[in-house]
Amino acid sequence: MVNENKKRVAKNTMMLYLRMLFYMAVSLYTSRVVLQTLGIEDFGIFNVVGGVLSMLGFLNASLTGSTSRFITFALGKNDYSLLRKTFAGTSNLHFGLAIFIVVIAETIGLWFLNTQLIIPENRIVAANWIYQASIISAFIGIAQMPYSSIIVAHEKMNIYAYMGILEVSLKLLIVYLLIISPFDKLISYSFLYASVSVLINFMYAFYCHKNFSECRHKLFWDREFYKELLTFSGWTLYSTLSWMFKGQGVNMLLNIFFGPVVNAARSIAFQVNSAVKSFISNFSTAFNPQITKLYAAGEYTELYQSIIQYSKISFLLLFFLTLPIFCLLYTSDA
């Protein structure tokens, strides 16, 4: 059993790393081409407008962690009725949250976009189109999040990897379409980008409905169930708020004080930073379901051994990744 789990984690990690390497290579390339095609100012506008909606996404980030944990826990207990209830309940919460965020985005968010951000007057209309495309993408993305959690809980990392590779391949196609587009390139890019996001999310939902019988929607009210889920989400709310202010909050301040050109520079640096962090997050995605399932099954000895082993591997992965960077900084100072 232990060896099987180790082999599964190793295989899943390999699949996620292949996904990440492909994703990183294509993303860095497309960022450069999109920057050249849109221009510095429009590129900055695209990122800062999308950032307004990302600031509202901290609620989704905290709820997503709880969704993944509760679905994996139910799967680890081999309790099918609990699994179906958990999926249906988390789907209801995510759909309600998606509607709530759309309402806030179309009121407070829209006011903030048009009155507080520094956007050239001749690009205000384009910025509003970007914003609406981002709202569509965000609504679909939030509503489908339980499907992603189901795939990870079942440790179908190959599907997760294939979807990621397909997504970046479509984004690569977007770059070509953007270059030849006769329309406003900023508006075209925002809707093409949103279309890819919507398509991938629908493919996640289609796969889950076809392969996992627990993926069935049902409206129900269970006060204790929702209370437990939301209470667990509250513990992650503080960290997601901090990351949100550190990321998109700084982006908003840079725009207000320095304009969209500085946003363009930071967005490129932010993408490189995210690519580096994805090395460890991919490994965590591979072993987190195992940890939760072992805890749910009451196999504590194997649980502790796995935690120690995975912690060592995480440290080594991060060490070998950052060592060349520290060496480069040290030699450049010398």
Kindly label every feature range from the protein language model:
Residues 330-334:
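Conserved small/polar residues in nucleotide/adenosyl-binding loops
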Residues 107-111, 120-144, 161, 165, ...:
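Alpha-helical transmembrane segments of multi-pass membrane proteins
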